[in-house]
C-alpha cells in the first residue's frame, strides 16, 4: 500500500472546518464530527487497554477486532451515506457477550468501576462508548444513518462492562460492589 497521508498539517482546518470523505466541509463542532471524535476517543482508550501486559489472549484478540470495527465506523461516519458496519459485526458482539457473560457469577448488586487496572480501563472504555452512542443517536435524529452503528455501540458498551468483570477475575480479583447499606 502506498502512502495514504503524505501531508498531515494541511492548514485547511484553521478556520474551524474539516473535510469529510466525500469532499464536503463541515464545522468541527458539527454533530457528525463530534460522533467521529467520540468513536476515535473510544478506539484510543481501547488501544490503551491493549497495552496491559496480562490481558487474556482471547480478550486481546476481541479488542483488536473491535478496534478495526471502530475504525470502519469512523470511515462510515466520515462519508455520509456510506455503509461499512453491518449486522454481522453486531452479531459478533452478541456472540462474545454470551460467551463471556456465561462464565460470570450473577450480579446481586451494582458494581463500581475499578478492581484491577485493566478492568478500570475497560470501564472507561464503556463510558466513552456510551457517549459515542449518544452522539450517534443525536446525529441520527438530524439525518438518516445506517442502523448497525448505533446497535454496535449499544452492544459494545454491554460487552465492555462484561469484559471489565472478566478482567477483574483474570487478575485474581473480583468486582467492586456498590454498598447500599454503607455508613455515610
Swiss-Prot record:
Organism annotation: Cupriavidus metallidurans (strain ATCC 43123 / DSM 2839 / NBRC 102507 / CH34)
Lineage: Bacteria, Pseudomonadati, Pseudomonadota, Betaproteobacteria, Burkholderiales
Gene3D superfamilies xref list: Cobalamin adenosyltransferase-like
Function field: Adenosyltransferase that catalyzes the conversion of cob(II)alamin to adenosylcob(III)alamin (AdoCbl) in the presence of ATP and an electron donor. Acts as an accessory protein of IcmF that functions in cofactor repair, since IcmF is prone to inactivation during catalytic turnover due to the occasional loss of the 5'-deoxyadenosine moiety and formation of the inactive cob(II)alamin cofactor in its active site. Thus, receives and repairs the inactive cofactor, which is then reloaded onto IcmF in a GTPase-gated step.
EC code(s) of this entry: 2.5.1.-
Region (Disordered): 1-21
UniProt family annotation: Belongs to the Cob(I)alamin adenosyltransferase family.
SUPFAM superfamilies: Cobalamin adenosyltransferase-like
Assembly and binders: Homotrimer.
Protein name: Cobalamin adenosyltransferase
Binding-site positions, ATP: 10-13, 18-19, 28, 130-134, 154
Keyword Nucleotide-binding in annotation: yes
GO molecular function: ATP binding; corrinoid adenosyltransferase activity; GDP binding; GTP binding; transferase activity, transferring alkyl or aryl (other than methyl) groups
